[in-house]
């Protein structure tokens, strides 16, 4: 299926936040972050444009620091090692005040705009098409993260000229009280209707095409299960699969299978009666050893929406649930291009698929 969807914005994401950039970055893509710096609670925040959900490979680390008069550090991390810092001895952000931060991808560098004004340009140190995730940490409250392909929308400015003649500032947080900012829900407690906006309805801008093969997006509001579709070209390192839906109130289990012919290379099987997320591989009709360990509790809940992102790496699958990295599953079938079918079934309502 030809690619032609749009990546929905992240609305009121909770910090620390890590989310996927569907298809990876390309020349002409723009990411716009709307938020506010908290009045207190720390001296720094950071925006990382990175590969995957871990922080060992960060193509662009943008790190405002409210220290020594205020400055911004820009850097790149490769295989866990930081490069040479670039410091901008000017602070365009104010504590307690709102901001618009825009990253525009150009062939030679990132163009960074703050509140409609050019702040800096950061030359690429690694190929930008490897970037498929965005991570934000520190003393910020976020309203939205939106995505746009300005090459596909030439009538719109590269970065919106938002006038901040009167800064919108946040009151200091009362001492002894920690509350979520208005409109922000804790993990796994967002209303289903809110998630449906993210998974079914498109947002302004264009989804980013995959650097190798454009992903197929199936925007049907409801799918019949079991759902089965091909993965054009099969899997390869950096290829990602996105599956979103809502778990039925009386659900017992559901599954996501990545198949190679009659074999199942990766079987992801949340089981509510066992409070477990089972992973396995089936070869020639025989199942291997199950993997069940999780770094934290059950990430799926009856009656609630979910989003599963499966990133294929050279040695494993990396799996994130609701923008939180969950586990890695090492390949047992290692012929990745032969893994070319996706199957989804069980006690869910399926609302969004991207292969």
Curated annotation (Swiss-Prot):
Please tell me one Gene Ontology term that the record gives under cellular component: cytosol
The alphabetical list of record keywords is: Cytoplasm, Immunity, Lectin, Nucleus, Repeat, Secreted
Domain Galectin residue range list: 17-148, 227-355
Domain description: Contains two homologous but distinct carbohydrate-binding domains.
List, alphabetically, the PROSITE patterns matched. GALECTIN
- Where located? Cytoplasm; Nucleus; Secreted
Its gene?
LGALS9
Q: Mind listing the GO biological process terms from this record?
A: immune system process; negative regulation of CD4-positive, alpha-beta T cell proliferation; negative regulation of type II interferon production; positive regulation of gene expression
Q: Which PANTHER family match?
A: GALECTIN, GALECTIN-9C
Give a Pfam family name: Gal-bind_lectin
Q: Kindly provide the name given to this protein in its UniProt entry.
A: Galectin-9
**InterPro entries to which the protein is assigned, alphabetical:** ConA-like_dom_sf, Galectin-like, Galectin_CRD
Species in which this protein is naturally found: Bos taurus (Bovine)
> Which of this chain's residues are annotated to bind a beta-D-galactoside 2?
267, 271, 281, 287-293
- Residue positions annotated to bind a beta-D-galactoside 1 are 48, 61, 65, 75, 82-88
Known function? Binds galactosides. Has high affinity for the Forssman pentasaccharide. Ligand for HAVCR2/TIM3. Binding to HAVCR2 induces T-helper type 1 lymphocyte (Th1) death. Also stimulates bactericidal activity in infected macrophages by causing macrophage activation and IL1B secretion which restricts intracellular bacterial growth. Ligand for P4HB; the interaction retains P4HB at the cell surface of Th2 T helper cells, increasing disulfide reductase activity at the plasma membrane, altering the plasma membrane redox state and enhancing cell migration.
GO molecular function annotation: carbohydrate binding; galactoside binding
